């Protein structure tokens, strides 16, 4: 089928490339000329495991192209997927200006049978509002909701082998078209859930907010473990082995970040407040996660006898999680910002997200390094802020010989306590007593 993705950011790019790989004729549009030029040269603007292989395959199969121009070629498309950003406004409400801008532009170029699919994360009721908006302008296009559930770092696998495909429609024609588009995945067993527009939109918000709640809860249980001497890793495993709960998102750490969880839980909280519902759980999760970076800094300060000013601290890991170059709302960046405000000298390293971190945060007391070993030279403490597997493989004996003070605080619980102590480090992890 002939389909287009408007917005070649993370969601649009991954979705478009894989749809091309699955056999559809795909056009990805973005208003960033530099990005489009690079993509046409097979240069990805994001890091995502295996995505470069699928990009090459789709381009060489002549099923994928990139453009920055809305044209009459759009009249040949069966569906237009809107995958632009929906950033948060000041009070947490989703800003839909990019969605409406995309809808405005495509409506002038597509045929009357083309389906407009909203894949951007939008508040419940948005698709119905878009239908009314188009009708007021004299258009009667079908509009569907199709939220994405891709995890950065494993997005290719998530798209090819999804837990479920959710679509919100208001007629059989839209459902039939989406079934055709997703046929390669449905045929291999993917669950295809059809619901109404509002429910489909709400599923995305509730899914992300529930996962954020699991993270916030286990983080607070880690604090309890520190007080009473319980083992947070064993606790997470013991709880997660219950099939009613599940093991995923029960890893204690410095809080959740990224482009989705913080934004989506704020938007859901804004939605319930607009409907006069006092959802105390959402408020508590938002507050808990907001305080988490400060709590991590407090732990670091405790290990340094309460004296942070003038200290040299290595931060290993800058992205909000491993497997991505995304530093948006990264707990590591938040922690660094707090430390810099306390006159700390920070030496930072990340295996993938270094360049994005440099664009995001600059300071006279902040130095970025091309290797973890270099970042750790002559520091008072090493902070593991992101769960990169590379950190497990570092030559920690070499690092031990380079540091000023052999102390590690592992905010992701990825290193082996006994191994670190055998080398000579004072090792502390989230959920262990300080």
UniProtKB/Swiss-Prot annotation:
GO terms for molecular function: NAD binding; UDP-glucose 6-dehydrogenase activity. NAD(+) binds at residues 2-19, 30, 35, 121, 152, 263, 328. Gene3D superfamilies: Cytochrome c1, transmembrane anchor, C-terminal, NAD(P)-binding Rossmann-like Domain. It catalyses: UDP-alpha-D-glucose + 2 NAD(+) + H2O = UDP-alpha-D-glucuronate + 2 NADH + 3 H(+). It comes from the Bacteria. The active site is at 260 (nucleophile). InterPro entries: 6-PGluconate_DH-like_C_sf (IPR008927), NAD(P)-bd_dom_sf (IPR036291), UDP-Glc/GDP-Man (IPR017476), UDP-Glc/GDP-Man_DH_C (IPR014027), UDP-Glc/GDP-Man_DH_C_sf (IPR036220), UDP-Glc/GDP-Man_DH_dimer (IPR014026), UDP-Glc/GDP-Man_DH_N (IPR001732), UDPglc_DH_bac (IPR028357). One of its GO terms (biological process) is UDP-glucuronate biosynthetic process. Its EC number is 1.1.1.22. Substrate binds at residues 148-152, 204, 208, 249-253, 257, 321. It holds the Pfam family UDPG_MGDP_dh_C. SUPFAM superfamilies: 6-phosphogluconate dehydrogenase C-terminal domain-like, NAD(P)-binding Rossmann-fold domains, UDP-glucose/GDP-mannose dehydrogenase C-terminal domain. Keywords: NAD, Oxidoreductase. It is an enzyme of class 1 (oxidoreductase). Pathway: Nucleotide-sugar biosynthesis; UDP-alpha-D-glucuronate biosynthesis; UDP-alpha-D-glucuronate from UDP-alpha-D-glucose: step 1/1. Belongs to the UDP-glucose/GDP-mannose dehydrogenase family. This is UDP-glucose 6-dehydrogenase. It comes from Rickettsia prowazekii (strain Madrid E). The gene is udg.
